[in-house]
Structures are given as C-alpha cells and as structure tokens.
C-alpha cells in the first residue's frame, strides 16, 4: 500500500541576528557564535539557522577568527 504524504507548510526561519538588531558580529562573543555551531564544532548552514546570506558570511568570518584565537574549538572533544 502506498503511504500518504502529510502536507503542511513549514514555518519560515527568522534571522536571529537581524531580529535582535545586532549590528556587529564580534568574534569574542562566543555565546552568540555557539548558537551557529553544531555539537561537532561545524558551522551550521543557512537552511538550518535561517540567517541571511550577508549575516551568514559575517558569522563565518567571526567563527573562523574565534577558532584561530583559541576561543572556539575546531572540532568537538569526544
């Protein structure tokens, strides 16, 4: 028997940075940056977080800077 698909509209993700009026994404703000990193330490994509392209680029740069400075890990510790 064929299964029926359950339809439904998914809720549009909101850009957290734009919604909270964050002008500058600081690499030293690790609490903010950790929201956009997976448990394994990877940067989460836009389709998961809902950030705009501009803010995703800024986040990526800030996360990479924080990793180099030693504020964030490159990979998660098991």
From Swiss-Prot:
Stored InterPro entries: Ribosomal_bS18 (IPR001648), Ribosomal_bS18_CS (IPR018275), Ribosomal_bS18_sf (IPR036870)
Gene3D superfamilies according to UniProt: Ribosomal protein S18 (4.10.640.10)
Keywords: Ribonucleoprotein, Ribosomal protein, RNA-binding, rRNA-binding
GO CC list: cytosolic small ribosomal subunit
One Gene Ontology biological process: translation
GO MF term (any one): small ribosomal subunit rRNA binding
Superkingdom to which the source organism belongs: Bacteria
Pfam families: Ribosomal_S18
Signal peptide (UniProt feature, chain positions): none
Family of the protein in this entry: Belongs to the bacterial ribosomal protein bS18 family.
Matching HAMAP family: Ribosomal_bS18 (MF_00270)
Function field: Binds as a heterodimer with protein bS6 to the central domain of the 16S rRNA, where it helps stabilize the platform of the 30S subunit.
Name of this protein: Small ribosomal subunit protein bS18
Lineage: Bacteria, Bacillati, Bacillota, Bacilli, Lactobacillales
